Amino acid sequence: MEKKFKRTTVTSALPYANGPVHIGHLAGVYVPADIYVRYLRLKKEDVLFIGGSDEHGVPITIRAKKEGVTPQDVVDRYHYLIKKSFEEFGVSFDVYSRTTSKTHHELASDFFKTLYNKGEFIEKTSEQYYDEEAKTFLADRYITGECPHCHSEGAYGDQCEKCGTSLSPTDLINPKSAISGSKPVMKETKHWYLPLDKHEGWLRQWILEDHKEWRPNVYGQCKSWLDMGLQPRAVSRDLDWGIPVPVEGAEGKVLYVWFDAPIGYISNTKELLPDSWETWWKDPETRLLHFIGKDNIVFHCIVFPAMLKAEGSYILPDNVPSNEFLNLEGDKISTSRNWAVWLHEYLEDFPGKQDVLRYVLTANAPETKDNDFTWKDFQARNNNELVAVYGNFVNRAMVLTQKYFDSKVPACAELTDYDKETLKEFANVKAEVEKLLDVFKFRDAQKEAMNLARIGNKYLADTEPWKLAKTDMERVGTILNISLQLVANLAIAFEPFLPFSSEKLRKMLNMESFEWSELGRNDLLPVGHQLNKPELLFEKIEDSVIEAQVQKLLDTKKANEEANYKANPIRPNIEFDDFTKLDIRVGTILECQKVPKADKLLQFKIDDGLETRTIVSGIAKHYQPEELVGKQVCFIANLAPRKLKGIVSEGMILSAENNDGSLAVIMPQKEVKPGSEVK
């Protein structure tokens, strides 16, 4: 039998305050968490939604070093940007604090000391990379090198961003310091470790036997770790940014960010509720839920629970809904490559359209596998679903009521069989949406809510009240009453998903408030109830708007290619005699035309100083024929003739290929006689 809880504590992964929030963060963590919290609030359940910025860790110190500022400067800037963006986007945290707060430093230090005094840590001396030039130990993100799996350059000591593989610094091929660029050496250092192997027995029972209902990706990743055997994990590291390890002999060492950050959920709760925070973290009648991305599964399902269990007074998570990753236009989202749709920029570019992004990210949520966000899909879902289905039905029902009944809810007369069938269809929506939300299937739940609008559109299309207005106003009133009840139900059903639109619709309907318990009823709007003026809930997004966003990404891709450009390696040496076999000359282009049925080919007539020759070249995508006529080009004159599209080509025009794939024909700087040799 499922346990009943008195209250629910919901946490969402703390975003790193070293950059803005992007759509991958939203789709993976914050939108689903917010949907669930809003759903519980509508049900009048006791729920607390905890958020905050993770402000320690190496990525922050690296950014500070690059920018020539302090780590505090970096986290201050991004904490406030992230917090403001979440507020504008409607992520309804009860508290959004930070891990540089005094409350957090005190609580995290006390947590460490409790475990230390209970003998829950082991001390180990190990060898770690050390930068002799900078005279500092190197944390994992301060070491880069070649990934041993995909062999891409620039992999970090904890993860390869290219293939996503988790790494240790010693896994890297040809490691180097991100501080000085020098090759690091191994040097001894002492740290404290949480012996996860000591907790393996109860973790195996708790996860593999007691929580088989967890999502397959969560359960599977945990099982994989447990089957491999858990190892002690360092809880301290050599850094000067973070919470100092609160024991003697720990100078120059701070709490490892994975140990420090999840305690932030607790300290943020304490900051909000200094007198009652323990109820939300220590009472067995409180349900604890962590919303995270798949890269955080192990920390929230194995490491943090082991910390809580070792402390002894905390509850453990009841569920850890974790999503897979969201990609962008077929490529992995990357902060370092600026390959992302940033939330603060979206809010500027699409004012008043928070719900469009919330809808699209939920409709395409990576709940069971990695999914892809494309701007074309964003536009299609807005125009074909939000505008054409939901918005269209609401507008028709409201405008027809305004036209025929002065925006007052008409009476419902005798019901036809079709009316009864329609009412029965939407009476079941509450149970269906609830069933899906209770098991964190947000994508399907939103689809079920949208189905209400489809029912409404079909009902209006089938009954055609505008045709009955001249002969049977009683029937028109019944049709519009049923339609308006559907509209009111839509406002409630979509409130967790599209809060801004539901609020707008609530005002149009002149309703004071929503309650989840009312969903599915057909008497939400009493007869004679005065409606307000109808407005469009959503508006079409034009092609030009989407093209601008796509162009922004193309510009980013081009900038990345420019920044990462490396010329191809030089080919093996050849003998001078081999080179002299090539007869490279300058010719003047007399004629140029496109080759029929060949997108890439141009046909040239070239004066080579001796005669006129024909050459076919694959540069049609890079030049128009008319811009080349009269120009001089370099070509190989003694290449054996070959037939291309039925045309005999008597040579090869030389071009240079740029890093973006574009071609530039090689031309002499000064005009020379046709047939001049290139030496």
Curated annotation (Swiss-Prot):
Its EC number is 6.1.1.10. Gene3D superfamilies: HUPs, Isoleucyl-tRNA Synthetase, Domain 1, Methionyl-tRNA synthetase, Zn-domain, Nucleic acid-binding proteins. SUPFAM superfamilies: Anticodon-binding domain of a subclass of class I aminoacyl-tRNA synthetases, Methionyl-tRNA synthetase (MetRS), Zn-domain, Nucleic acid-binding proteins, Nucleotidylyl transferase. It catalyses: tRNA(Met) + L-methionine + ATP = L-methionyl-tRNA(Met) + AMP + diphosphate. Its main location: cytoplasm. One of its GO terms (cellular component) is cytosol. Zn(2+) binds at C147, C150, C160, C163. This is Methionine--tRNA ligase. It comes from Bacteroides thetaiotaomicron (strain ATCC 29148 / DSM 2079 / JCM 5827 / CCUG 10774 / NCTC 10582 / VPI-5482 / E50). The gene is metG.
